[in-house]
Amino acid sequence: MLIVLAGCGGGGSPASPFGTTITITSAGVSPTQVTVSPGTRVTFVNNDSRSHNMTSDPHPEHNDCPEINTVGLLQPGQSHKTGNLVTIRTCGFHDHDDPPPPGGNKWTGKITIR
């Protein structure tokens, strides 16, 4: 006897268990918001012509999500990964060398772990 099981997915995009990439260009970060599964590492890629120093919010303490601080300084063409994001929460990030005003700027974003 052969039993086949099938399922339908719900709406929305599931969190990726394989990691996500955030790209930095002169226009800013893309995407500005990502959702990942616990234990995921996010890769930041600098495709801009200048360096960016990516850190966790808030500025200047950078202590909300220390796993983001492992990205650090990215020279043009470089990529670095966050540490394992294991705690379920939303983490803001920004370019430390171009700190955001209230409301953010083009080098800010959020990573949601769920």
Model feature map: region roles:
Residues 32-55, 79-87, 91-92:
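Beta-strand cores of secreted/periplasmic/IMS beta-sandwich domains, seen most often
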